[in-house]
Regions:
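Conserved beta-sheet core of the metallophosphoesterase superfamily
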Residues: 1, 171-211
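Beta-strand-turn-beta hairpins that frame and shape the catalytic cleft
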Residues: 44-56, 164-173, 206-208
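Residue-level marker for buried hydrophobic side chains located in beta-strands
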Residues: 55-57, 87-90, 127, 173, ...
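Short acidic low-complexity segments
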Residues: 156-166
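Core catalytic region of metal-dependent phosphoesterases/phosphodiesterases
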Residues: 41-43, 63-157
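Flexible, charged surface loops at secondary-structure boundaries
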Residues: 48-51, 80-84, 119-122, 166-167, ...
Length: 211
């Protein structure tokens, strides 16, 4: 029975360490890993005849905060549906820091995200997680990446801080830089989308295009 209980708990974003003892006991203790992989990658497949990737880029939705704009997120989905766009790149801080006061209590913020982030069966979100998104892990030991991977398959997490999306022979980096973060993947791509800054700009930098 303990394995079933542990699996149920792990599905909600918690992890456990197995401690083995010479008397044959196995003791399970909560494990908080702050050094979660900073970089990950995923392959976004396209047909051979399709030469153009159409996507929308968003960032810093801070769901659960007093200033959240779920209406604009719904507008984004409606725009994608009307234009036949099936991919959204989300550059992090999808939720607000659970230590911050907000319209939703801190312990309910992750469930609020799961229930209120829009869904359409034809739209995928590729998400790099930011400094606000790591707050459930730091405060409760609850990994948002695990939760989204288990309960929202349309919200594809590709790492904390940065992640790499391979598209045919090219690579796209989503980045949300913060202090406890080492940037490596952005050296592998000509296109980098940044979150965290809360303003829009385009910059050419050493043959890279940064947004």
């Amino acid at each position: 029975k303990i394995f079933n209980y542990l699996t149920m708990i792990k599905n909600t974003g918690y992890d456990f360490k197995r401690n083995y003892y010479s008397n044959g006991d196995i003791i399970y203790t909560p494990e908080v890993r702050y050094n979660v992989p900073a970089s990950n990658e995923v392959n976004l497949l396209m047909s051979q005849n399709d030469e153009t990737l159409r996507a929308v880029v968003i960032s810093d939705t801070h769901i659960g905060s007093e200033k959240e704009r779920l209406d604009l997120l719904e507008d984004t989905y409606n725009y994608c549906i009307s234009k036949g766009i099936h991919v959204i790149f989300n550059c992090g801080d999808i939720i607000d820091n659970i230590s911050n006061p907000g319209k939703v209590d801190s312990e309910d913020r992750v469930n609020y995200l799961l229930n209120n982030y829009p869904f359409d069966k034809s739209i995928l979100n590729f998400i790099v997680l930011g400094n606000h998104d790591i707050s459930p892990l730091k405060v409760y030991g609850q990994n948002l990446m695990t939760i989204l991977n288990n309960y929202r398959h349309d919200l594809v997490t590709i790492g904390y801080c940065e992640g790499l999306i391979n598209v045919k022979n090219e690579a796209i980096v989503l980045s949300h830089p913060y202090i406890d973060c080492s940037l490596n993947a952005n050296k592998q791509s000509k296109i980098v989308f940044y979150g965290h800054s809360h303003f829009y700009k385009i910059k050419n930098f050493l043959s890279q295009v940064r947004y």
